[in-house]
Design a protein with these regions (language model features):
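Extended polysaccharide-engagement surfaces of secreted carbohydrate-active enzymes
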Residues: 9, 24-286
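Amphipathic alpha-helical segments of tetratricopeptide repeats
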Residues: 19-23
Length: 286
């Protein structure tokens, strides 16, 4: 709309938002939403239920942002890897695991690609760098209480994002390493729901496996069938600092359930320390 109406004030607002979003694209074209309140309906290549980012970023590229065209190129390459028999699968390993695709992903993203193809061509003169290509140490996004780390071949996301979705237990909050990625290995792990539930069944992949385990590193106590974890704690203190070439996070948290209740024995305090360097990450706790 901003482009069609030549509303440059609105375009500037959208531009700043899209530039910030681009900070969260991984070097292989994946979108990092490991920290988000609605990450339960996202997958490695982006939003499972949305059309995608390509139309808007293509207009940005045409204006003055060639790096947006590079982002589209890398993401298309990822979509291609997840497409089999003309259908886009909801995860990079679904096809190999025998998990059926949902047609929603295919028609949603086909629509986004069509919106790009009907626009005037933009010449791509050279491959542009994306923000997470650079080794910059650490960036803090205060509004979402989330840090992006880039050291050597490692990329990581650390979050204490304490905004709850309308359904509790959907995303990590209490000082969590929500994503770890390596240039050669790709994703080592990414955060999952704190407790797996089909809270929006039409927008989520059904699961038929007998055993499920959360994919977010955490401290957890199960008592009388109730999980108490630092991932659900809204009263977490996080300190980030640089020391001797390490980016360190000191986290003081509590084991609570999704309703912020402590176990029977009372308040359980924990301290977890993370140290990031070019060699990797180490985690210790008390």
């Amino acid at each position: 709309y901003a482009v069609m109406a030549n509303d440059m004030e609105l375009f500037s607002l959208v531009e700043r938002s899209m530039e910030t979003h681009l900070e969260f694209m991984l070097p292989d074209g994946a979108w990092d939403n490991s920290w988000g309140t609605r990450s339960f309906k996202w997958t490695y290549w982006g939003g499972r239920t949305s059309d995608g980012f390509m139309g808007g970023y293509y207009l940005m590229a045409a204006a003055r942002h060639p790096e947006c065209l590079e982002a589209i190129r890398r993401n298309i390459r990822l979509l291609s890897k997840a497409t089999h028999g003309g259908l886009l699968y909801g995860g990079m390993h679904y096809f190999a695991s025998g998990v059926s695709p949902c047609i929603h992903h295919t028609f949603g993203h086909a629509k986004a690609l069509a919106s790009v193809l009907e626009l005037p061509p933009v010449k791509m003169t050279s491959l542009e760098k994306l923000p997470r290509d650079s080794v910059y140490g650490v960036k803090h996004f205060k509004d979402i209480r989330t840090w992006l780390l880039s050291q050597g071949d490692w990329r990581a996301t650390f979050t204490g994002y304490d905004a709850e979705y309308k359904v509790k237990g959907t995303h990590p909050m209490g000082g969590a390493l929500s994503l770890l990625w390596h240039a050669q290995a790709g994703p080592i792990f990414a955060a999952t729901m704190n407790q797996y539930k089909l809270i929006e069944a039409p927008n989520m992949q059904d699961n038929v496996r007998k055993y499920l385990m959360g994919g977010t590193p955490r401290v957890e106590l199960t008592q009388d069938g109730v999980a108490y974890s630092n991932l659900d704690d809204l009263n977490t203190d996080i300190t980030c600092f640089i020391e001797n070439g390490f980016c360190r996070f000191n986290v003081n948290s509590h084991l609570v359930d999704i309703n912020q209740q402590s176990p029977k024995q009372g308040e359980v305090l924990i301290e977890v320390n993370y140290a990031f360097s070019e060699q990797g990450v180490s985690i210790s706790m008390e």
